[in-house]
Structure formats: structure tokens, C-alpha cells
Amino acid sequence: MVKVLVLYVFHKFNDSVDHFFKHCIFRDENIDFLIIANDINFKFNLVNLPEYVMTMVRKNIGRDFGGWSEGLLKDQLYEKYDKFIFANSTIMGPFIKDNTRWTDYYINGLQDNIKLFGSTINNAYHSHVQTYIFSLDKEALAYLIEIGKFSITKYLRSAREAQNNEILISKDITDKGWNIGCLLKCYQGIDFTFKNKAKKDYGDKLHTDIMYEKYRNVLWNEYEVVFIKGNRIKVTSSLIR
């Protein structure tokens, strides 16, 4: 069976983090959860996580990627797994109408030549998977570790560096000849390497950052993308499974 590691990172405990703890963690013999607190003073014993959940407390160095990197590379934990889901504390969900596990959406997206998959793709600059939640297979992760996109020796220091890293990991994937993908139906079947059809030839079919309220129920809905950025868009709790 495929072994999956879910890495969730936060730096401040708030309602979104509490929601993830209560609604997004479940027991499965093939899925492990690692919760990473980018807060050296955080006390996990106060939040009563299930005993099967792994936890890590660290200094807030390197932002989300710093936390994910330490989770992956400390004791080479990533070597035990086949596929990986990364999430940060801006996410809110999951929005699912049936009994499908939310992790399945991100793992099942890693098929054919797609090595990096998320809820949404932003086509500003280089087309890139937005990293509030995304998945990688082991081959792609190993490559990104090799070229330093996940590192515990060179940390991202600024918001600009973090934004650039989000863009560049997608570029690294497509430059390698692999594809990226997301849950947005309007992007199904698109080859984001643009080898056979140039990006400009898609015209207005490729959008920039659409994870905003004004695009909700116009270009996407929460059940299509499973998780939204809760720091931008507010929804009623009754919509969440």
C-alpha cells in the first residue's frame, strides 16, 4: 500500500488550527499526520491530539517551508513514505459532500505525469500550484530536496522569498518535464509544461490568483477545491463536513 505523510504547519494557534485538529485528522494505517508548530513555546499537551499524531515544536525559522523541511528531513522521515501532502494554517475545510477522505483528492491527483498537485494554480508569472495545500510524490520531493527547495541549512527569510519559492518549485517540476495539476475543473487536461501549446495560446482561460471571494461561485466553489484560504474567505461552518 502507498504510505502517505501529511505535514501541517502553523505558527500561531487560532480557530483555523483548532478546526484542522478537530475535523481534518483521522486514523488510517497508511496515512500519518505530522503537526509542526513554528513556535518554540507551544504546548501540544494542551490541545489533546490523538496519540497516533506526530508533533514537532521548533523556532519560527524559514516560514512554512522551514517547518515542512525540518519535518521531512529530521531523521530522514520522508524516506518512509511514498506520497506527501503539505498544508499551512490558512486552509479551511474540507468541503466534501460524500464520505471521500479529503486526502484522497490530493493523492489521486498525482497520476500520469503530474508530480505536484494542489487545490488551485495561479498563472501569474510562471504557472504554479499555490502552496497553502499541495501534494508531491516521492520522486518529485527527492528532486526538490536535492536542489535545495526543501532544506534545513538554507532557510527562507522574507515573504518575498517564500512567494518566490512557491513559484519556483512548480517551475522546477515543469522544467524537469513533469506536469503540475489542481482541482479546478477548468484546468483539467492542461499540460503546464506548455511544450505543445504555448501559454499565450490559452488566452483568458488561464487565470491569476482566484482564491478570493469575488471569484467564488463564478470560477470555483468550495466543493470543487475542497479547501479554501480561510484567511481571505469566510464561510459558515455548516458548509464544512
Feature annotation, model-predicted:
Residues 1-241:
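ER/Golgi luminal nucleotide-sugar-dependent glycosyltransferases, focusing on the catalytic module
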